[in-house]
Curated annotation (Swiss-Prot):
Source species taxonomy: Eukaryota, Viridiplantae, Streptophyta, Embryophyta, Tracheophyta
UniProt source species: Oryza sativa subsp. japonica (Rice)
Protein name from the UniProt record: Heptahelical transmembrane protein ADIPOR3
GO cellular component, one term: membrane
GO MF annotation, one: signaling receptor activity
Protein's membrane topology: Multi-pass membrane protein
InterPro entries from the UniProt entry: AdipoR/HlyIII-related
Purpose of the protein: May play a role in abiotic stress response.
Transmembrane segments: 74-94, 210-230, 247-267, 275-295, 307-327, 332-352, 375-395
Keywords of this entry: Membrane, Stress response, Transmembrane, Transmembrane helix
Segments on the Cytoplasmic side according to the record's topology features: 1-73, 231-246, 296-306, 353-374
Name of the gene encoding the protein in the UniProt record: ADIPOR3
Positions on the Extracellular side per record topology: 95-209, 268-274, 328-331, 396-403
Length: 403
């Protein structure tokens, strides 16, 4: 009896172990990669990518799959890395705004001025300038300061005697040794004076259009990366993620217009507001259209590509207008060259996306790496990065010249 009971217990253990092994196999098969033909209809998007699909995995496994190999791995990381690139660029740009003078860089003013509170002196100088006959024209000083960016001579109208007059009249209780000040010291002081009054007379232009573009780029890249990571979880989450992805594309295209339009036409408010309003309305309309359920169907791939390409191509109008107004400005030509290059990146990306090249030529050969959507992602990041450099040119141009 005891022996029989022992055999029954042992048999039960073996049966339990076998059940656990089969359950483990079923779990691994369920969370394994499948072929295109095994996908539900809502996940079928590109019939030329044949294998390595994740299909309706639980959310924890979906999140962890960012660090495993499947046919969406590079789609996730190309735009996630792009997001962090633009995050760093945004932080860098925010630290480069020329909004105050570096008082530590002044060479001779602290030696010549008694008990110098340089921040207070900066305000006193600007307030006093209009009272001096030779320096009352603040617009002339602004123009000279702007031209000094590309000139060896700083403030040519501020001669030695005018400088002495400025210091003795505007800072009578601070300035001493006027007759003992050498020409070399006066020249250096002249540069210091220019450095002090420049931020008060020449304010940096608004940065919000540039930050709007950077925000649109980061939103697009992060939304795209998240979409490619999470859409395999369920039909509902795929529905939400795809619309977020399309909204990100529209946001990137729309906000890409903001820097060139605002900085090109900031002195022409009518055209500036007209172009900004048109592209904003077009972007909102595109997002609304993308909410339609049929918009995500595979047969609408070409329509999606044409819609986004047409939205971007509408930027040709303000670019041509800019060239008509500023054909003599090197900055206008420089920014246009960047914009043409950006358009090439985006245009080629849209073409690759719509035609599904190269995987349509060799189905199954580019499942993991090299298929069209990955190339499209790389071209989008390249186009946005090119546009970032165009924006830097606009900022420097308008900071120096204003209207």
């Amino acid at each position: 009896m005891a022996a029989a009971a022992g055999e029954e217990v042992e048999a039960a253990r073996w049966a339990e172990a076998e059940d656990e092994r089969k359950e483990g196999l079923r779990r691994r098969r369920r969370y394994g990669l499948v072929e295109y033909r095994a996908l539900p209809g809502y996940m079928r998007d590109n019939e030329y990518i044949l294998r390595h699909y994740r299909c309706e995995w639980p959310l924890p496994q979906v999140l962890l799959s960012a660090f495993s190999i499947h046919n969406e791995t590079l789609n996730v990381w190309t735009h996630l890395i792009g997001f962090f690139i633009f995050l760093v660029l945004t932080i860098y740009t925010a630290t480069q705004v020329p909004n105050v003078v570096d008082l530590q860089s002044l060479q001779h003013l602290p030696d010549v001025l008694r008990n110098a509170d340089l921040h207070k002196i900066q305000t006193e100088l600007v307030a006093c300038l209009p009272s001096l006959p030779h320096l009352s024209d603040l617009q002339k000083l602004k123009d000279e300061l702007k031209s000094s960016w590309n000139s060896i001579e700083v403030l040519p109208s501020l001669s030695r005697w005018h400088l002495l007059e400025l210091l003795s009249s505007c800072l009578p209780h601070r300035f001493t040794h006027s007759n003992e000040t050498s020409l070399s010291v006066l020249q250096s002081m002249k540069e210091d004076i220019a450095n002090m009054i420049a931020p008060q007379l020449i304010r940096p232009i608004p940065r919000w259009p540039f930050y709007a573009f950077l925000g649109g780029a980061m939103f697009c890249l992060l939304a795209s990366s998240t979409c490619h990571l999470l859409s395999c979880h369920s039909r509902r989450l795929a529905y939400i993620m795809l619309r977020l992805d399309y909204a990100g594309i529209a946001a990137l295209i729309a906000t890409s217009f903001y820097p060139p339009v605002y900085y090109s036409f900031m002195c022409y408010p009518f055209f500036c507001n007209l172009y900004l309003s048109c592209i904003t309305i077009l972007g909102v309309a595109t997002i609304a259209f993308s909410l339609l359920p049929v918009f995500q169907n595979p047969e609408f791939r070409t329509i999606r590509a044409c819609l986004f390409f047409g939205m971007g191509a509408s930027g040709v109008i303000p670019v041509i207008h800019k060239l008509i107004l500023f054909w003599h400005q090197p900055e206008a030509l420089h920014t246009t060259a960047y914009e043409v290059l950006m358009g090439l990146f985006y245009g080629i990306g849209a073409l690759v996306y719509a035609t599904r090249v190269p995987e349509r030529w060799m189905p199954g050969k580019f499942d993991i790496a090299g298929h069209s959507h990955q190339l499209f992602h790389v071209l989008v990041v390249a186009g946005a990065y090119t546009h970032y450099h165009s924006g830097l040119v606009y900022l420097k141009w308008r900071d120096v010249q204003g209207c």
